[in-house]
Design a protein with these regions (language model features):
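Nucleotide and nucleotide-moiety/phosphate-recognizing core
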Residues: 3-13, 19-102, 111-113, 201, ...
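Flexible, gly/pro- and Lys/Arg-enriched active-site loops
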Residues: 53-60, 75-78, 82-176
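N-terminal amphipathic alpha-helix/helix-capping segment at the start of soluble metabolic enzymes
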Residues: 169-190
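Active-site mouth loops of central-metabolism enzymes
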Residues: 191-208
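Conserved small/polar residues in nucleotide/adenosyl-binding loops
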Residues: 226-227
C-alpha cells in the first residue's frame, strides 16, 4: 500500500542583512532552508544593495529572495524561518522596529493564500507593495505572479515604487560590485606547463606574483589563477 504524497506549495521568501558578513548570513539562511526535509529551493534572485527604509540611521542592506516548494503550512514555515534567524544570531531585544539585523527571513507569498492573524503572520507581506528591495528580487523569479489582494503582478507593483539608491550587486570577497557601473576586466594567470599562451612562464611563485602585480597596475579587476 503506497502512502499519500504530501501536497506541496510554492512560497517566496525575502532575505536581508545589514550587519557583519551580509552575504554569508543570506547564503547560510538559504542553505539551512534547503537542508530542511520539507523544503526545496527552486530559484534564487540576484543580490541588491539598498538604503535602509523607515529607520534610516543604520548600515546599508544586502537583499535577496528565494522561491521554495514546501509541504509545511504557513505557520510551520514561519517557525522554520524564525529558528534560522535565531541560529544565525539575530536578536530582537533592544532593537528598534525595522532596525539593524544579522538576517531577516520573511514569508512574502505562499501560493495565492491570504493570511492575517495579527502581528504573528500576514501573507502576502503587509508592505510588499511598497518595498522595491523586496519586489525587485521577487521579480527576478516571479514577475508575473499576481498579488492575491491587489490583483496586480509583481512587475506592475515594482513600477509603482522608487528604486533610487538601490543597485544589483555581485559580492566579491569583501567588496560589492555594482552591475553595469563599469566594464570589468579579468586577467588569466596560468601556472601550468602546457598553456597555449604562457605555458611554463609562471611555474615559480615570484614570476606569478610579478605578473599578477602588473595586471593589477594595468587595471585588471579579478585575476583567475590556474595551476596544477
Amino acid at each position: 500500500m503506497s502512502l499519500p504524497v504530501p501536497s506541496t506549495h510554492m512560497a517566496i521568501l525575502a532575505l536581508g542583512s545589514n550587519l557583519g558578513e551580509r552575504k554569508h548570513y543570506i547564503e547560510a539562511s538559504v542553505q539551512a532552508l534547503d537542508q530542511h526535509p520539507k523544503i526545496q529551493i527552486v530559484d534564487t534572485s540576484f543580490f541588491y544593495e539598498t538604503a535602509p527604509m523607515y529607520y534610516e540611521d543604520q548600515p546599508r542592506f544586502l537583499n535577496g529572495a528565494c522561491k521554495i516548494q514546501t509541504s509545511l503550512t504557513p505557520h510551520e514555515l514561519l517557525d522554520v524561518c524564525q529558528n534560522i534567524e535565531k541560529q544565525l544570531g539575530r536578536s530582537k531585544e533592544h532593537v528598534p522596529r525595522n532596525g539593524p539585523r544579522v538576517v531577516d527571513v520573511d514569508i512574502v507569498l505562499y501560493d495565492n493564500l491570504v493570511v492575517n492573524d495579527g502581528d504573528r503572520l500576514i501573507i502576502p507581506h503587509a508592505r510588499l507593495h511598497e518595498r522595491a528591495f523586496v519586489l525587485r528580487p521577487v521579480c527576478d523569479m516571479a514577475p508575473s505572479f499576481v498579488h492575491p489582494i491587489l490583483q496586480r503582478t509583481m512587475a506592475s507593483l515594482l513600477t509603482s515604487t522608487s528604486m533610487a539608491d538601490m543597485s544589483r550587486v555581485m559580492p566579491v570577497r569583501h567588496d560589492m560590485w555594482a552591475w553595469g557601473s563599469k566594464t570589468r576586466v579579468m586577467g588569466i594567470l596560468n601556472a601550468t606547463p602546457d598553456s597555449f599562451s604562457d605555458g611554463g612562464e609562471h611555474m615559480h611563485i615570484d614570476a606569478a606574483m610579478k605578473t599578477a602585480r602588473q595586471m593589477a597596475e594595468a587595471g585588471v579587476d579579478p585575476v583567475s589563477y590556474t595551476h596544477l
